[in-house]
Amino acid sequence: MSKKSQLVFAMVAGELSGDILGAGLMAALQKTHPNARFVGIGGPRMEALGFESLFAMEELAVMGIVEVLSRLPRLLHVRSSLIKSITELKPDCFIGIDAPDFNIGLELKLKAQGIKTVHYVSPSVWAWRPKRIFKIAKATNMVLSLLPFEKAFYDKHQVPCTFVGHTLADDIPLESDKASARQLLELDPDAEYLAILPGSRGGELKQLAEPFVKAALLIKQQFPDIRFVTPLVNQKRREQFEQALKAHAPDLEIHMVEGKSREVMAAADGILLASGTATLEAMLIKRPMVVAYRVSPLTYEIAKTMMQVNRFSLPNLLAGRDVVPELIQHDCTPEKIAAAVGVELNRDFAPIKAEFERLHQLLRCDASQKAAEAVLALVDAKELN
């Protein structure tokens, strides 16, 4: 354990899921180093623990190649400013949390300045653009991976990697309480609910709000008594979703909640959601789900040439087989979504739930504590790779 009176950590989290991981890591580090200082880019959870944000986390919350290109000048300005600030700060360690296209370039520059670097959340190098492993090897002293199969990939390429598990698997109980969640959200205890989660970023709602709303109309025809509930990450995303609802299904009633996505999923009988970390959360809450995703045509055509796997949702990747339906790009239509939701709501869920339970146990490792121990061991290490 480091004997310094005050450790300084620079950290960059790019979106909501990174803020959750960052806050968990901060809390674990503060157990042994209560005076530690944390600086960089973080979200509200990290800031609640004393994190000093130099830029708003929203600056990095972009998706798809087209959107990134349009924001590139600003992203490059943020990164160059961070390089200058962090180099002057001389932290004991820099921790880039996810956001690999932003953070790995930042880590490369900082490591060249003699700063120890950690990348928390392995980029999907096993799924697409596998040659990124060579840049990661140059940019980081250590990768903290959330998924068990990732470590073998890094070991094969002799890149230091520690499997820490996933904080969501630690936080979410093995059995989620539907009745309590409904009581908290003031939902009918006896009705059938479908949770609709179109994503947390503006670009995701731009692509998914319309097909999800139109699918809900079709689902209502199949299941006349079903009700819909949608958590939106903030007021801006709520307004965006309301516009889609008004434009495409003005008479459809969807109960909207600000935040509380986990409670909404726990309260639901089934879930329709965008691909991403939320699919892992839905798996851990153990509800039937349909995963859908759509990006701009250009982004899709470019990404398609780089993909190494034929699955994209975390439950299917973890299971190594298709346990939940995936509808991507041209298959992400209201008709196909509604049909898939109908199948999932009517099928025997017991075998899928059993697989979700197995995967939950696999990921339950006290991730924040393991990550903190790995970071502190690196801080104490005399030799760098």
UniProtKB/Swiss-Prot annotation:
Cystine crosslinks: none
Listed EC numbers: 2.4.1.182
UniProt GO molecular function: lipid-A-disaccharide synthase activity; phospholipid binding
Protein origin, superkingdom: Bacteria
Alphabetical UniProt keywords: Glycosyltransferase, Lipid A biosynthesis, Lipid biosynthesis, Lipid metabolism, Transferase
Keyword Secreted among record annotations: no
UniProt pathway: Bacterial outer membrane biogenesis; LPS lipid A biosynthesis
Cited Pfam families: LpxB
InterPro entries associated with the record: Glyco_trans_19 (IPR003835)
GO biological process: lipid A biosynthetic process
A GO CC annotation given for this chain: membrane
Catalytic activity field: a lipid X + a UDP-2-N,3-O-bis[(3R)-3-hydroxyacyl]-alpha-D-glucosamine = a lipid A disaccharide + UDP + H(+)
Function recorded in the entry: Condensation of UDP-2,3-diacylglucosamine and 2,3-diacylglucosamine-1-phosphate to form lipid A disaccharide, a precursor of lipid A, a phosphorylated glycolipid that anchors the lipopolysaccharide to the outer membrane of the cell.
Family that this chain belongs to: Belongs to the LpxB family.
Protein name: Lipid-A-disaccharide synthase
Encoding gene (name): lpxB
